[in-house]
Structures are given as C-alpha cells and as structure tokens.
C-alpha cells in the first residue's frame, strides 16, 4: 500500500522569520491562515500576516520524514496545536513594556526556535523506534535549538535554499 504523505515541510519567511508548516514540498496560499492573528480580518496590521503568499519570500527550514502517515498526521496536528497554544498565552511583563511594533517583531523572531523546540518536544513525547524519523535542515545550527531524541536521525546534507524543497533525485537527474 502506497503511503499518501509522510513528509513534513517547514518553511520560514526570509524577512520576518515566521514559520509555515506544509504537507507538500511547496506552499499553498491557504497556509497563511496558520499564522496567528486574533482578529478575523483578512489583513493583519503591520505585516503580522502577509496579504498574499509570495513564494520568493519563503525558504525551506527543515524537512522531516516519518515512518508512516499516521505518525506524520499526529505530529503535524500537535505542532499546529502548540502554535495555537503559544498565540493565546499572555505576554510576559518584559514584552509588555516594549512598544507594539517592537514587540511583534520580537515575537515573530522567536518562531523558528520555538517551532524547532516544539517539534523536538513532540518527538520526545511520542515513542518512535530508534532512527525512524529523518530530519533534514537548511542550516545545521538550527538543530541546536533542541535536544533531539534517539528516534531522530539528522541528515548530514543541508537543504538547498530555493523557492521550495527539491528532492535529491530530481536535482541529480537534471544534471
């Protein structure tokens, strides 16, 4: 039986460091609704949610391969729940002292480390077999944001930055 989807793709915005999760190797415009914004308006203030998905502004952050689709779905939903939980938490007193534009930028800058740490936390809680989850990063220093469980095997090859993820076979065949 062919697995429908067992890959999780995570993209980051090159200017704001916001993070989007995807089930495919390219982003769909509906992915923007993952970005936290409390009001139900199509355009968020001061760029908290871009009005349109510009694919040249989003670069691959990491790719995770799971043993099967059910594990992938579980981790994907938990990551979305972590993000939702984080967006409704009250701000710390240090953040409240900052002017609103500075506060928003600081919160957005923390999305990459928070997402990576959340992923590691979920993988620590789930009991996957050893080396069953493969992780490929665009920057090896990003792996330092978390303590990875033994079930995670970090790929030595970095992701090539482009407007989407490119599979190794596709790049090799093009040469």
Curated annotation (Swiss-Prot):
InterPro entries: Ribosomal_mL67 (IPR024629). Keywords: Mitochondrion, Ribonucleoprotein, Ribosomal protein, Transcription, Transcription regulation. This is Large ribosomal subunit protein mL67. PANTHER family: LARGE RIBOSOMAL SUBUNIT PROTEIN ML67, MITOCHONDRIAL HOMOLOGOUS RECOMBINATION PROTEIN 1. Pfam families: Mhr1 (PF12829). Belongs to the mitochondrion-specific ribosomal protein mL67 family. It is found in: Mitochondrion. GO terms for cellular component: mitochondrial large ribosomal subunit; mitochondrion. GO terms for molecular function: DNA strand exchange activity; single-stranded DNA binding; structural constituent of ribosome. It comes from the Eukaryota. One of its GO terms (biological process) is mitochondrial translation. Component of the mitochondrial ribosome (mitoribosome), a dedicated translation machinery responsible for the synthesis of mitochondrial genome-encoded proteins, including at least some of the essential transmembrane subunits of the mitochondrial respiratory chain. The mitoribosomes are attached to the mitochondrial inner membrane and translation products are cotranslationally integrated into the membrane. mL67/mhr1 also has extraribosomal functions, being involved in regulation of mitochondrial DNA recombination, maintenance and repair, and generation of homoplasmic cells. Component of the mitochondrial large ribosomal subunit (mt-LSU). Mature yeast 74S mitochondrial ribosomes consist of a small (37S) and a large (54S) subunit. The 37S small subunit contains a 15S ribosomal RNA (15S mt-rRNA) and at least 32 different proteins. The 54S large subunit contains a 21S rRNA (21S mt-rRNA) and at least 45 different proteins.
């Amino acid at each position: 039986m062919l697995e429908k989807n067992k890959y999780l793709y995570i993209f980051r915005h090159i200017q704001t460091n916001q993070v989007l999760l995807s089930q495919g190797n390219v982003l769909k415009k509906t992915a923007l609704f993952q970005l936290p914004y409390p009001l139900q308006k199509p355009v968020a203030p001061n760029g908290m949610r871009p009005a349109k998905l510009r694919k040249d502004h989003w670069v691959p952050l990491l790719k995770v391969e799971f043993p099967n689709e059910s594990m992938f779905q579980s981790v994907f939903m938990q990551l979305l729940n972590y993000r939702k939980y984080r967006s409704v938490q009250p701000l710390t007193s240090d953040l409240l002292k900052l002017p609103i534009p500075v506060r928003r930028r600081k919160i957005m800058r923390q999305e990459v480390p928070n997402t990576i740490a959340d992923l590691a936390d979920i993988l620590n809680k789930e009991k996957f077999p050893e080396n069953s989850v493969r992780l490929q990063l665009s920057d090896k220093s990003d792996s330092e944001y978390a303590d990875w469980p033994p079930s995670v095997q970090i790929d030595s090859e970095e992701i090539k930055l482009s407007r989407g993820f490119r599979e190794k076979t596709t790049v090799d065949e093009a040469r």
